[in-house]
């Protein structure tokens, strides 16, 4: 099944602009309860996903005041989250969600469209398995 039915669109997703400060990003993540969020540039292009571990590694090697003011887009990310396009299938996401809480969805120009959550992939696959039994 095509992922468009399960897409959580950009307007409903917590994401960060790449020029957002680390201090603001951490405050936003703490408030939202998310441990990782997509990062996009000013044009809406997906840059990557940043997580709590990325911030912790930054704080371990950078003075706190300098780290707090650093733009999120300059923080080194340990993991590169793989993206999919709108024509991807839910079945094709199973492998991706074993390592990612969500899968970023981008268009042909790399513009961020939204996400598919691990929960939705599991729910979809469980429904298929139940239908077969």
Named regions from a protein language model:
Residues 61, 77, 82-84:
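Regulatory sensory and allosteric helical modules in signal-transduction proteins
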Residues 29-32, 37-54, 97, 105-120:
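A glycine-centered beta-loop-beta connector
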Residues 1-13, 68-80:
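Bateman (tandem CBS) regulatory domains
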Residues 1, 26-27, 46-48, 64-69, ...:
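Short, flexible segments with low predicted structural confidence
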Residues 54-69, 121-133:
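A short, polar/charged loop-to-alpha-helix boundary motif
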Residues 15-33, 40, 82-100, 106-108, ...:
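The conserved cystathionine-beta-synthase
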